[in-house]
A protein has these predicted regions:
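N-terminal glycine-rich dinucleotide-binding loop that anchors FAD/FMN and/or NAD(P) in oxidoreductases
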Residues: 23, 27, 33-35, 42-69, ...
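A conserved FAD-binding loop/helix module that cradles the flavin
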Residues: 18-19, 156-160, 266-313
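A Rossmann-like FAD-binding core segment of flavoenzymes
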Residues: 60, 66-93, 98-101, 164-251, ...
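Active-site glycine-rich loop that binds ribose-phosphate moieties when present
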Residues: 126-133, 146-159, 179-180
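FAD-site-proximal beta/loop scaffold in flavoenzymes
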Residues: 122-138, 228-275, 292
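FAD-binding core/adjacent interface of flavoenzyme oxidoreductases
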Residues: 1-5, 73-142, 224-227, 250-254, ...
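Residue-level detector of alpha-helix initiation sites
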Residues: 11-12, 110-112, 151-153, 270
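Beta1-alpha1 glycine-rich phosphate/pyrophosphate-binding loop at the start
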Residues: 3-57, 143, 153-176
Length: 313
């Protein structure tokens, strides 16, 4: 089962790349483990022409478009990728076939590590949120909380940003110790600061009612934003020896090219802020760059064969 490109990850980045490569008449397979990051969300936003659709609808449409251009979508999980020492990669699936390919695009995304608080994970993607651009408009003018977590810079920025959508924002530093300057900036922004350890979210009748603190207080809130710790699913890339930057993430150029020839990456696996529409664009750009990489190989092979046939150039 030999391909021009195997795309690992069937989200917005991977499917966009698969479609573009199919349109380029490349033999492409998209391998999807079926565990999208945004699965808990009922709607997606900020994606032109798809605003308000469910994530499942977007993925179904993307798969249909990939297959419509001759691409394959394979359900499975990749356990490893190996370079065969020439210009080929071997992609091994759990309990499935081995795929041989000339190029690889990894679009496996990331996972959100949330604070360990009762009620928080169960409401993730509903009324516990992290991206104001994705969900802020839907909770506009509501009582909003911002919960301090391990991702300190992200959380402080998030608190100031969320204020654009509501005049009633409470920041719960929780384990974050604020400096005097940080307190001043948040207060000047019109954000109320409630100190004390957060113990749980008050969830009743399938709805968030508030944030409960260790001293027994419950602050009523209709939605809570939290800053997760973003952990990329980059094991396949690091296993291939792709260079990692000072920030701990795999390094790529503007097209998604890694330090390993023939290996590209796109979407949240190398870009934590990437939204759906950004990831889709990155997948498309990576596909074009990968096609040009294959084109260079095709031309070199054609010249070698031409000369071997005894034609004097």
């Amino acid at each position: 089962m030999e391909y021009d490109v195997v795309v690992v990850g069937g989200g917005a980045a991977g499917l966009s790349a698969g479609m573009m490569l199919g349109r380029s008449r490349r033999r492409v397979a998209v391998i999807d483990a079926g565990a999208p990051r945004n699965a808990p969300a009922t709607h997606l936003h900020g994606f032109l022409s798809r605003d308000g659709a469910s994530p499942a609808e977007l993925l179904a449409a993307g798969r249909a478009e990939v297959m419509g251009y001759g691409g394959e979508v394979i359900t499975g999980r990749v356990r490893g990728i190996e370079h065969d020492g020439e210009c080929r990669f071997v992609v091994r699936l759990d309990g499935g076939p081995e795929l041989t390919t000339r190029g690889v695009l990894v679009a496996t995304g990331l996972r959100d590590e949330l604070p360990d608080l009762p009620g928080l994970r169960a409401r993730w993607g509903n009324d516990v949120l992290h991206c104001p651009y994705c969900h802020g408009f839907e909770v506009r003018d509501a009582p909003i909380g911002v919960l301090g977590g391990d991702n300190r810079p992200f959380t402080l920025h998030q608190a100031a940003l969320v204020r654009q959508w509501s005049a009633d924002v409470v920041f719960f530093p929780n384990r974050i110790v604020l400096t005097d300057e940080e307190r001043e900036r948040l207060t000047a922004r019109g954000i109320r600061i409630v100190d004390g350890a957060v113990t749980r979210l008050d969830v009743r009748e399938d709805r968030l009612h508030g944030v409960e603190l260790a001293d027994g207080r419950t602050v009523p809130r209709a939605a809570v934003f939290v800053g997760p710790r973003f952990v990329p699913h980059d094991e396949l890339l690091t296993g291939l020896g792709c260079q990692v930057g000072e920030n701990g993430w795999v390094s790529t150029d503007a097209t998604g090219r890694t330090s390993v020839p023939g290996v590209w990456a796109a979407g949240n696996v190398v870009d934590s802020p990437a939204q759906l529409i950004t990831a889709a664009g990155a997948g498309s750009a990576a596909a074009v760059a990968l096609n040009h990489h294959l084109l260079a190989e095709d031309v070199e092979r054609a010249v070698t064969n031409y000369r071997a046939a005894g034609v004097v150039v």
